[in-house]
Structures are given as C-alpha cells and as structure tokens.
Amino acid sequence: MSGSAVTCDTCTGTNKPNTAETACVVCSITDYANCDKENVCAACDNGKYLTPTGQCVDSCDKLGGYYADGNVCKRCSPECASCSTAGADKCLSCPAGRVLKYTSESDINGGGSCVDECKANTDGCADCGATIGGSRYCSKCSTITEVPINGVCASNTVSRANICTSDGKGACSACTAAGYFLLDGGCYKTDRQPGKSVCTTESGGKCTTCANGQVPNNGVCPTCPAGCSKCSGSSICTACLAGYYLSSSKSVKCSENSTNGGNIITGVPNCVSCKEPPASSGTVTCYVTQEPSVNPTDPSVNKGGLISGAITGISIAVIVVVGGLVGFLCWWFICRGKA
C-alpha cells in the first residue's frame, strides 16, 4: 500500500533483516555459522563461542564469570569470578572479599570454592596485611612455628622450610623454592591463585614478570589504573577487565560513553561485558547485559508499594462496610417482621 512502512522479517539466502527490519543485509559479525539478524548470531564457527547477546568471541574468559560449554558461553555460579565449569566448587577465581580454596591440591585446574577472606586472629593469622584482587590474605601468623604460604598460615615443617625462610616472627623473610615469590610476608606460587594473578615468573624468590604487564620494582609489581587488566606504566591501559572497554589508553565502563582520538564511542545501558567497536568508533560490542536491580529505598518503588497497599486497604474497608450495612438491614427487616 502506498505510504505504508516496509517491514522485513525474512530474507533470502544468507542475508538477514537489519536491526530496524526495513531491509535485508549481510550479517556484519565475523565467525558466525548462523545469523539471526544483522548484528545477532545464533551460532559461531571457527572455534568461536556464542555470548548471551549473540556475539562470537575467541574465549569465554573475556566475558568475566563465564565458561565454555561446547560452543556457547555459559554463566558460572554466582559464587565465582571465573570457573572451569558449572558449580560453586568449580571456581578458578573469586570476587573481591572472597578467596579460593582448592577442592584438591593435586588438581588445581579443577577449581575450588570461594570462602571468606582473611580475618585477623582467626585461623592462626595475626595480621591480614596482604591484599590481592581486592581480597585480604595473611601476612603474619600468630605463632612463630607457622608462616603464610599462598596467603594461609601453615606449619613451617621441613618440607615447607624449603619454601620459606622464616623471620622467626610468624612471617617469611625470603622464598627459596622454585616457582615461589615473596609478597607481604608470605610466599606465593606463580601457577596457582592468588599468586598467579600477581606474578607469572620469578627468580631467586622475587617476581620477575608481573601478570598485569608492569615492570616489577625489586620484586614488587606496581598496580594498574582502575579497570585495567594490563598496563604500561602507571596511567596507560593496554587491556581491560571484564565490564570495561579500551578508549584513549583508559578503561571505560561498558555503559559509559567516551571520546577516542576525536571519535565518539557510545556505551550500552546495563552492559556488563563488552569490547570497543571496530575502528574505535560507534557503539561498543556488548557481550552480556544485566537488568538494573531494584532499590527498595527508591521513593518511586515505595510510592508504588504505598499506592497498591492503599488500594488494597480501601477495597477491604469498602467490603466490610457494605457487608455490615447489608447485615444490619436484614436484621432490621426480620425483627420488624416478627414484631
């Protein structure tokens, strides 16, 4: 009909409807096996994995809190920051304030459970002065016969004495075993949590390669700016944590806009995992979205509750009054009839 809008929901061949469903276009996402719409995949190929928003990625790890199940990225248990597979005992790393306890020390790749972070004067720890990834670990044990190994107090037996040189006060003064480095009074292994999130190689008990790309200063790894997983120097991001994208060497939240060399990058509301757009211009590619949580103290929420509560209360009151009136009239006429 003349003047009516054209709607396209089915296309021929491999073309798909564009976002506005006004035309058929070639799917713009690379590595797709089946495309639902212009920017939405139904399946991925070439060893890629499908995200919840229909994008194709080379690893589910970059989503943060997802694991690969076949060719699909699936959500880890809420207890985990990352995981090997489904289950609260399959965590590979933990959210801030929680620490990883491996299910089996002989199979650390299988993961473990996230438990409470270090608390002073608990579990043999006198001081929780080591902080890694937003979680606290023991830096000094309560008794001089124990030392912090991987952030937990352990008896300094003959076997562990080969790992840590005790300072005689419940902490380590040096790490002597291969693969261990000294950090805040404890010895940490480079191939397991929490040490691997700080340091990937060591020499002589000191870190030589920082996990965040920084150059260690006498064995100590400088921190990166907020939102950065890797950086060069104290202010230049080279890679971002899940929930951020790279713009002008800074990490910006997926939901926020930014300017990159004169180009505008537009964030996506409620997006919690993303990457910067092609050519660093346009809208970010969002991997995961999350509905905003409802704040029970929000006045609008309370008003809604009060309105619905008031309506319910008024309705009940009307029913009671009408019922009472009908009952009274019935009694009145019955009594008068008898009289």
Protein language model annotation of sequence segments:
Residues 1-339:
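Disulfide-rich, cysteine-dense extracellular ectodomains and adjacent flexible linkers of secreted
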